[in-house]
Each structure stands twice: as C-alpha cells, then as structure tokens.
Swiss-Prot record:
One of its GO terms (biological process) is protein unfolding. It comes from Prochlorococcus marinus (strain AS9601). It is an enzyme of class 5 (isomerase). The keyword Cytoplasm applies. One of its GO terms (molecular function) is protein folding chaperone. This is Trigger factor. Its EC number is 5.2.1.8. Residues 442-467 have a biased composition (Low complexity). It catalyses: [protein]-peptidylproline (omega=180) = [protein]-peptidylproline (omega=0). Transmembrane segments: none annotated. Involved in protein export. Acts as a chaperone by maintaining the newly synthesized protein in an open conformation. Functions as a peptidyl-prolyl cis-trans isomerase.
Length: 474
C-alpha cells in the first residue's frame, strides 16, 4: 500500500454500530492545511495586502496557527471519512462520532505526521426472523351491534337539534349550561392553571370535565352559585393536577336545552339527503357495518404484524428510533402550519421535548415493525415487479398532469413501491398464518382461519382478507 494512502480498519460494535480506525497520511494533512491557508487568504482582509496575495507567515500570525489547524482538521476528518465509507462500501445511518474528541485531536495534530482518528457510526442492522410461516394469533370475537344504528341516529338528531332557552326549571343531564367557574387547589389555595372561565357552554353529559363537575351543576337554577369539592383523576392529562383535591366556585349564568327533530322522512332529507327514514337507516347501517368489518380486519392485521415483529432478531440502533421520532415531530409541525398556526412560536423546546418523549414508544414500535416486514421480504423473496409499479402509477397520471406543483416522480415511485410491497407482505402473512377467535364470555378460543399455500382451498378454513395496516383512533 502506498505511503500516502488512507488506512481503514473497521470493528463491529453492539447495537449495530461500527468503529472506523483511520490512519491518515501526512501528505493528506499537509495538502488540507495548505488548501485551508489558500482559502482563507482569498477572503481575508489585512491592511497593506491585496486579496489572495497575503504571505503565508503573515496570515498565520494574524489568524493563529491553532485556528488554521482547527479549520484544516475539520476538512481532513470529513474528507477521510467520505473516502473510508467508499473503501468499505458502508452506508452510515448517523453522523460519525469522534471517539477521542476534536480538542484532543487538535492538541496533537501536526501536518508533518500521519494522524490516527477513531470514528463510530450506526449502520443498518442485520435482520433475522426466528419464524415467518405458521404464525398463530388470537383475537376477540366481536359481533356487529344493531344498537349502534339507533345510537348513530340519536347522534344525528343532536347535531340537527334546535337550541332553546330554559327558564322555569333546574339543570338536568342533557342540557347546555352556560357557566362561569374558578378553581383552586385545596391544599395550597393556588389557582388551577386553565381552571377559570368567565363564560363557557357546557353540555351536561357524564364524563365531561373532571368527575363530579357536571353532576354538581345538575339541579342548579339560573343565578345559583355552588362550591364543588372535587378530585382530579390520578391519570389526568396535566401531571401537576393528578390526584389533587380541588375547590371550584361555579355560577350557572344561563341554561339551554336541545329540541330534537322527529325521526321521520323530513329528518332523513335534512340530515342525510335521503328520501325516507327507511332509506336513511339502511344507509347508516351499511356505513356502520363497513366500518365494523374494516375495524375487525385491522385488528386481525395488527395482531399478525405484532406476531411477526415478535419473531424479529435485530440490534436496532438508537439513531433509527431518533429519525422516526424526528419525522413524527416534523409531520406534526406540517399539520400545524397547514392549519395556519405559527410553528416557530408554537414549537418551543419544551414542546418538542415533550413530543419526542411521548412519541418515542410508538416510534420504536414502528421501526421494529418495518424492519420485521423488511426481513420477511428478504426471507421469502417477496418483491414488487415493475409492471405492478407502472400499473399503480397510471392511477396518478391525471393528478400529476393537473397539479400546479412539481411532482417528485422518483419520490412518488418509491412511496408507491413501498405501499405495494407492504400490501403483498400482509397478504402473504394472511395466507401463511393462523387466526383464532376467542369468545369473550366463555374465554374459549375457536379456530376460524388457517390458510397456507397447501391448504388454501380447504373447506374448513376461512381465508383472512387483505386490509391496510391502520388502527382506528379512539
């Protein structure tokens, strides 16, 4: 090996990290120092000298040898790092970390000598599945509840209700109370942050506000003032208030009630643009059943994906989780911006940290699941063919041609390819896994679905159907 060649040695570390031990030749160090001096000389302004004509020694005296070496060292490390990655054909997941620290390297740096540098970085983990075929999962057996149709109708009636004033009776559940209130902690007497309002419309329904608040307003009359001694739940959203006792002074300023429309053909026309109540009920039933079936499919797929993830063997580097967390925060910021909110003022360091902490568990699960699917694709040689991508792209031709914005075709192709691959992987899981349904009341598991390539047409098995990997948010 030539004396002026970079020497690279790599050592695998736990958690999918790699250590790079670099020996950088003195020729590289000299070249970078001279390039740094020439670069600074072209822009430095020193009285008595023209730009680019400043003697080397004058420049060193003016700027300082340490500062020059620091600038050169940054260039040396970056240049050698990029070269080392090419030599070893390694794609890093994270920025390299200097093991000895920059200041330590700078202290011993000399352009006349070779330089030894140790850097560490994260790389993609090696993936392995303990098992891919014959996964078995158990889900709760659930039936469509016809009562949900009536509940949906009632909800619709409430949406189209007339609001009328109440003057001759006390408040009751179902009313809309206009209240003012002021809350303080019982032990300290300190006012509760967000616990004060001059006027708020409050629907008197159970589980609104903290326990006892709504119940305390029931039976009050307009003009009444009442003291409520309450307690915040232990799992309350604001940590400072959890489990604390509180005192609220509440005044009932006004009272209203909902006048619900009759369930008839006129209501069907008003609420759902249907000709009759029978037609409206039929439409609601179809929507609810479709949603129910989709939810059941989603639950089944979630269980299969969880089972697959449990079979994954991989040392996942921290940087992969960090990237997922950062992407989640950026997506949240984009949603805020689309709503017209000032992202810069809203996303304080405290909020960003809070979001990072709260989303990390889900981010970790997402990364594990994606890696498990990737491992499945590699293990079972499941791929997306070019004709499948071309066919999918045709669905977007009109949108692309009509869009006023420049569409990144390469990025779109990548997204569509990933979506198609995920669909194929989920179908494969359904066809090669066993799903058991357990009856909640008896707690007995009943086999309802087992399909493999060999038994796909067996009459005693039920093939699970394709679905997308989504959870219904509560």
């Amino acid at each position: 090996m030539a004396k002026d060649a970079l020497i690279v040695k790599t050592t695998p570390l736990p958690q999918s990290r790699i250590s790079f031990e670099l020996e950088i030749p003195s020729e590289t160090c000299k070249t970078c120092v001279n390039e740094t001096i020439n670069s600074i000389s072209r822009s430095a302004k020193i009285p008595g000298f023209r730009l680019g004509k400043i003697p080397k020694q004058v420049l060193i005296q003016r700027i300082g040898i340490t500062q020059l070496h620091a600038s050169a060292l940054e260039k040396i490390i970056d240049k050698s790092w990029q070269e080392a990655l090419k030599i070893k054909s390694i794609e890093p997941l994270s920025e390299p970390e200097l093991v000895d620290g920059f200041e330590s390297l700078l202290a011993k740096f000399s352009p006349e000598k070779s330089l030894k540098v140790t850097l560490q970085t994260d790389v993609a983990p090696e993936l392995k599945l303990k098992k891919s075929k014959g996964l078995s999962v158990e889900i709760s057996k659930t039936k469509f509840d016809p009562k949900s149709i009536d509940e949906a109708l009632e909800k619709s009636r409430n949406q189209f209700a007339n609001i009328i004033p109440v003057t001759n009776r006390a408040a009751k559940l179902g009313d809309i109370a206009v209240v003012s209130f002021k809350g303080k902690y019982k032990d300290s007497g300190k006012e509760i942050d967000g616990g004060t309002s001059e006027s708020m419309d409050l629907e008197l329904e159970k589980n609104k506000m903290i326990p006892g608040f709504v119940e305390g307003i029931v039976k009050m009359k307009i003009g009444d003032t009442k003291t409520l001694n309450l307690k915040f739940p232990d799992d309350y959203s604001h940590e400072d208030s959890r489990g604390k006792e509180a005192i609220f002074e509440v005044n009932l300023k006004d009272l209203k009630e909902k006048e619900l429309p009759e369930l008839n053909d006129d209501f069907a026309k008003q609420s759902g643009n249907k000709e009759s109540l029978k037609e409206l009920k039929k439409d609601i039933e179809k929507q609810l059943k479709d949603n129910f079936e989709k939810t059941q499919k989603d639950i089944k797929i979630e269980a299969l994906l969880d089972a697959l993830t449990n079979e994954l063997v991989a040392e996942i580097p921290k940087s992969m989780i960090d990237i997922e967390v950062r992407n989640n925060i950026e997506q949240t910021a984009q949603r805020f911006a689309q709503q017209g909110l000032d992202v810069k003022s809203t996303f304080t360091p405290e909020l960003v940290k809070s979001l990072a902490d709260s989303t990390r568990p889900q981010a970790e699960k997402n990364v594990q699941r994606n890696l498990a699917l990737k491992a499945l694709a590699e293990t079972e040689n499941i791929k997306v063919e070019q004709d499948e991508i071309d066919s999918k792209m045709k669905d977007y031709e009109d949108a692309i041609s009509q869009s006023s914005k420049q569409i990144d075709i390469k990025k779109l192709t990548e997204v569509l390819t990933n979506d198609l691959l995920k669909e194929k992987l989920i179908i494969w899981l359904e066809e090669n896994s066993e799903v058991k349904e357990k009856t909640t009341k008896t707690s007995k598991a009943t086999k309802t679905s087992k399909t493999t390539k060999a038994t796909k047409t067996a009459s005693k098995t039920t093939k699970t159907t394709k679905t997308q990997n989504k959870k219904e948010k509560k």
